[in-house]
Amino acid sequence: MISFIVIGRNEGQYLDSCFKSIRKAIYENNLIDSEIIYVDSNSTDNSIDIAIKNEIDKIYRLTEIWNAAIGRNIGAINARGDDLFFIDGDMELVSNFIPLVIDDNGNLKYDLVSGNLFQIFYNKHGRIQEEKLEFRERQNSYKKPITGGSFFIKKEIYKNIGGMDNRFWCSEDPELGLRLAKKGVLLQYLPATFIKHHTDVLKNPKVTDLKKGGWLYGNILMYKLNLFNKFTYKRMLFSDSSLIVLIFCIICFFWGLKWIMILYPITLLIRIKFKISKSGFQKYIYLLCRDILVAIMFIPFYKKPIPTANIKYQIIK
């Protein structure tokens, strides 16, 4: 049995399409033994009404504290299925992906699996500005130590790893991926579209990122909790190489090798591929500010996860 777990907060604009896409996948693939669970993060719009109208099997509303990690964990705890599928309320499931991951008996073929995303970007007027595949260059199947926000996973594996760490209000999915990878469970990526994602276009994503502090808090905590995980360093080399160089330079500075500090700005220049344009300069400043803040904020202690028993939620259905 598979449990489809939908999470959302104020996603009424897209939620009906999300539910209908899951219903379509269930019908077209004859997944009779399945259920749909919706966990709402105390929405102020009509999300709950939409879930009720769509006759969702189980509906829960988080009432005091909420984030994506908490929502997914509550859904998993209340799921009857041996296999779980997580999807956000602003996404749609592509029905023809199901036969690639579910066998004739309705069981998940892989321990952890996902596919490509078809991104649909909307401007401030609500009109589609751009549509594209997230990973156009990835044409082959492979394994990687990351999950993303939507994926299929065996419930036993999700339970044994402790689910998502609810301290994270962002970056909860890559952190889960690192812990799973350390246990030998890598995500199987299939080069087929499995999700349509509706999202807004950000005018200045780098500036917004720094202002909200989402990347800073999530990634710092992720790196700190997984400091002795070899997959952490592989991720850092791929996405945060300048941060590694900065840390190395700081260590050398205190050893008296001050001249090595020149390596850091050179690394930044390499990362932006020597662009002399305005966008290149903005990225240079962004990376500089981000890396310095990460290095500083790595030291503080962070609160412990909230015990599941202390999380309050209302059972709507």
Pin down the residues of each PLM region.
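Short, well-formed alpha-helical segments that are part of the catalytic scaffolds
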Residues: 11-26
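A conserved acidic beta->alpha catalytic loop
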Residues: 21, 38-48, 91
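Glycine-rich, basic loop-to-helix element that forms the pyrophosphate-binding segment
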Residues: 62-79
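Short aromatic/hydrophobic "clamp" motif used to bind/position activated sugar donors
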Residues: 84
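Conserved donor NDP-sugar-binding/catalytic core segment of glycosyltransferases
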Residues: 96-127
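Acidic donor-binding loop at a coil-to-helix junction in glycosyltransferase catalytic cores
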Residues: 170-178
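Catalytic core of nucleotide-sugar-dependent glycosyltransferases
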Residues: 193, 205-231, 288-302
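Membrane-embedded multi-pass helical conduit in multi-pass membrane proteins
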Residues: 244-306
